[in-house]
A protein has these predicted regions:
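Short beta-strand and beta-hairpin "edge-sheet" elements
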Residues: 96-151
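Solvent-exposed edge beta-strands and adjacent loop segments
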Residues: 1-69, 121-137, 149
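Short, charged, solvent-exposed linker or helix-capping segments at domain edges/interfaces
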Residues: 74-76, 152-156
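Short conserved beta-strand and strand-loop elements enriched in small hydrophobics
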Residues: 11-12, 86-94, 108-111
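Beta-strand-rich interaction surfaces with strong enrichment in secreted/lumenal proteins
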Residues: 50-53, 77, 108
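Structured, beta-strand-rich domain cores
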Residues: 55-103
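Short, surface-exposed, polar/charged, turn-prone segments marking secondary-structure boundaries
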Residues: 39, 53, 90-94, 146, ...
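General N-terminal targeting signals
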Residues: 46, 61, 78-82, 106, ...
Length: 156
């Protein structure tokens, strides 16, 4: 059975004080993935190419927000993007609405078993502002993912 996207929530840890930064009013999130490169293993006598799996190459994730200069999380995100700070991100799925992650004593996410999670590291590489007729001002924020995302299913 499929899970609804509505009710999902994006979080990161503010490196200034290791506090939880709740990203307000996310509209969509896409591209949290690493593609597996190919290593060609074809011999000259072969008539079809053959491959083995190579290194994983992290991609660029994006999330869209209705940008609001009155929203502290949006201002802080823009500051962190400008600084090029690598952040740890947590995407809480809709199977545990309203359940934020904890932050442990070492400043890492401590996720709960009552919600599914997708954890990944990355720095924001874009924070453009889009102004169009009959819409809210929004930003499609780019994140260069670093390493392999970790998918943690709900267990309770």
């Amino acid at each position: 059975m499929a899970m609804k996207a509505q009710g999902s929530q994006l979080y990161t840890i503010d490196p200034l004080d290791n506090s939880l930064l709740i990203i307000d009013c996310v509209i969509s999130i896409d591209g949290i993935d690493t593609a597996i490169d190919q290593i060609e293993t074809t011999c000259l006598e072969d008539t079809t190419r053959t491959y083995d799996a190579g290194l994983a190459t992290p991609g660029t994730a994006t999330f869209v927000i209705n940008s609001d200069p009155r929203e502290p999380s949006h201002l802080r995100l823009h500051e962190l993007k400008t600084a090029g700070t690598v952040l740890t991100w947590a995407l809480g799925w809709s199977d545990g609405t309203g359940i934020p992650p904890d932050i442990d004593s070492s400043g890492d996410f401590a996720t709960t078993a009552t919600r599914s999670w997708l954890l990944f590291d990355g720095y924001m590489n874009a924070f453009p502002f889009s102004f169009a007729q009959n819409t809210m001002v929004n930003s499609t924020v780019g994140i260069q993912v670093s390493g392999e995302p970790v998918w943690i299913p709900k267990t309770v």
